[in-house]
Amino acid sequence: MIVFPAVDILGGRCVQLVQGKRETATSYGDPLLCAESWINQGAEALHIVNLDGAFGSSKLNAEKITDVIIRTGVKTQLGGGIRSLDDARSWLDCGVDRIIISTFAADDPECLTILSEEYGSDRIMAGVDARAGEMVTHGWERPAGDFLEWADLFIRKGAGSLLYTNVSVEGLCNGIDPKPIRDLLSTVSVPVVVAGGITSPSDIKILKEADAAGVVLGSALYSGKITLQEALEAAG
């Protein structure tokens, strides 16, 4: 299982949000320094989110993100504001190993087919953001139906992996809700990385036993509720 420390970037700074709300941002400084710190502690991959992109400014932070990709040299997956084929291609061409497409994939699932044919399905990850079993899109504001049906559609259209985020617990550091994760993992055949609420080594062990391919650690890691070493040991 891969542990992905999150490097969420807003206004050129590394931040963490609560429940995805911009006004809750806590700044942790320069994104590259944060990324290098996690790598020095043993991280072999990073989960980068362009929050300005998610909030509507897809080109902001491009220089910062490219700098992290080039100077760290580790595996990266990137999401946030990828809402066109041009957006997707530009990130893939700049060296991101895997892009995460959520709202764009829900609005136009054929984008997954096009991109997987051009770049390979292993570089295309679909984001499944869910609340109470229902997919939510457009900044987690619009309910869109059963999340398992969306996961199946995304895979059929070409996604080589999924990022599952339980938005009900994201950023709260209160632990995971294992049931929907197990439901998803038992029905799909592609790797699934899990985000949202992961706070303790026991959370990670539960996900490992359920056969999750990876976990994203954000608020719990930055607040010190779990150390990267503890996470890596639980995942190992």
From Swiss-Prot:
Enzyme Commission number(s): 5.3.1.16
What InterPro entries has UniProt attached to this entry? Aldolase_TIM, His_biosynth, Isoase_HisA-like, Isoase_HisA-like_bact, RibuloseP-bd_barrel
Q: Which residues cross the membrane?
A: none
**Gene3D superfamilies to which the protein is assigned, alphabetical:** Aldolase class I
What are the alphabetically sorted keywords of the record? Amino-acid biosynthesis, Cytoplasm, Histidine biosynthesis, Isomerase
GO CC aspect terms: cytoplasm
State the active site: 8 (proton acceptor), 129 (proton donor)
Q: What is its main location?
A: cytoplasm
What chemistry does it catalyse, as a reaction equation?
A: 1-(5-phospho-beta-D-ribosyl)-5-[(5-phospho-beta-D-ribosylamino)methylideneamino]imidazole-4-carboxamide = 5-[(5-phospho-1-deoxy-D-ribulos-1-ylimino)methylamino]-1-(5-phospho-beta-D-ribosyl)imidazole-4-carboxamide
The GO molecular function terms of this record are: 1-(5-phosphoribosyl)-5-[(5-phosphoribosylamino)methylideneamino]imidazole-4-carboxamide isomerase activity
* SUPFAM superfamilies per UniProt: Ribulose-phoshate binding barrel (SSF51366)
What are the GO BP annotations of this UniProt entry?
L-histidine biosynthetic process; L-tryptophan biosynthetic process
Question: Looking at the keywords, is Amino-acid biosynthesis present?
Answer: yes
- Pathway, per record: Amino-acid biosynthesis; L-histidine biosynthesis; L-histidine from 5-phospho-alpha-D-ribose 1-diphosphate: step 4/9
- Subcellular location field: Cytoplasm
The similarity comment for this entry is:
Belongs to the HisA/HisF family.
Q: What is this protein called?
A: 1-(5-phosphoribosyl)-5-[(5-phosphoribosylamino)methylideneamino] imidazole-4-carboxamide isomerase
Give the organism the record lists.
Methanospirillum hungatei JF-1 (strain ATCC 27890 / DSM 864 / NBRC 100397 / JF-1)
